[in-house]
C-alpha cells in the first residue's frame, strides 16, 4: 500500500468557532441545504464521535451516489476534525481510503486559518492521478467557500 500526502492552507474572515460550527458541528444538516448536489448526510453507525460512520448521498452526472465517511477525531476545543472516505463512489479503484485531517486556528483580523492534510492510501504502488487530486481539492475548496458564504450571509448563525 502506498501513502501519498498533500497539504493545503487557506484563510477566512470568519472566526474559528463560527466556521467550525458550520464545517463540523452543524454540517450534517447544513451541507445538504447549501450544496445542491448533496442530498443528505446520515449517521449509519455511532453517535457522531470518533468511529461514527456517515453516509453522504449526492448526485453526480445525473446519478445518485454515496460515500461512506468514518469519523476519526472530533476535537471541539481545538477546532480539529479528521475523517476518512472508506467506501462508496468517491473512491477511485486504485485507492483504499482517503483521510482528511483538518484544523482551524485564529487567523488575521479575527478570522481563521484552516489547515488540511489529505492522505491517499492506495492499493499497491498506485499513485493518485493529478486529475483525482485537483478534483478533490476543487470539491473541498467549493464546500469550504459555500459554508463560509453561508456564515457570512447569516450574521446571527
UniProtKB/Swiss-Prot annotation:
Keywords: Cytoplasm, Pathogenesis-related protein, Plant defense
Gene3D superfamilies given in the database record: 3.30.530.20
Gene induction: Upon contact with the plant pathogen Pseudomonas syringae pv pisi and salicylic acid.
Localization: Cytoplasm
GO cellular component: cytoplasm; nucleus
UniProt xrefs under SUPFAM superfamilies: Bet v1-like
Tissues in which the UniProt entry reports expression: High levels in roots and not detectable in hypocotyls, cotyledons, stems, leaves and flower buds of untreated plants. After induction, high levels are present in the vascular bundles of leaves.
InterPro entries: Bet_v_I/MLP, Bet_v_I_allergen, Plant_def-hormone_signal, START-like_dom_sf
GO biological process, one term: abscisic acid-activated signaling pathway
Molecular-function annotations in GO: abscisic acid binding; protein phosphatase inhibitor activity; signaling receptor activity
Keyword check for Cytoplasm: yes
Predominant cellular place of this UniProt entry's protein: cytoplasm
Family to which this protein belongs: Belongs to the BetVI family.
Protein name: Class-10 pathogenesis-related protein 1
Species name: Medicago sativa (Alfalfa)
Protein encoded by which gene: MSPR10-1
Amino acid at each position: 500500500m502506498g501513502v501519498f500526502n498533500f497539504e493545503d492552507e487557506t484563510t477566512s474572515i470568519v472566526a474559528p468557532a463560527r466556521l467550525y460550527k458550520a464545517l463540523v458541528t452543524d454540517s450534517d444538516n447544513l451541507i445538504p441545504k447549501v450544496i445542491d448536489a448533496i442530498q443528505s448526510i446520515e449517521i449509519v453507525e455511532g453517535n457522531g464521535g470518533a468511529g461514527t460512520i456517515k453516509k453522504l448521498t449526492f448526485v453526480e452526472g445525473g446519478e445518485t451516489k454515496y460515500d461512506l465517511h468514518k469519523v476519526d477525531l472530533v476535537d471541539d476545543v481545538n477546532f480539529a476534525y479528521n475523517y476518512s472516505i472508506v467506501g462508496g463512489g468517491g473512491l477511485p479503484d486504485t485507492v483504499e481510503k482517503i483521510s482528511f485531517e483538518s484544523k482551524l486556528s485564529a487567523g488575521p483580523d479575527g478570522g481563521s486559518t484552516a489547515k488540511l492534510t489529505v492522505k491517499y492510501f492506495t492499493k499497491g504502488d498506485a499513485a493518485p492521478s493529478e486529475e483525482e487530486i485537483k478534483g478533490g481539492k476543487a470539491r473541498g475548496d467549493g464546500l469550504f467557500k459555500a459554508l463560509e458564504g453561508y456564515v457570512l450571509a447569516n450574521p446571527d448563525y
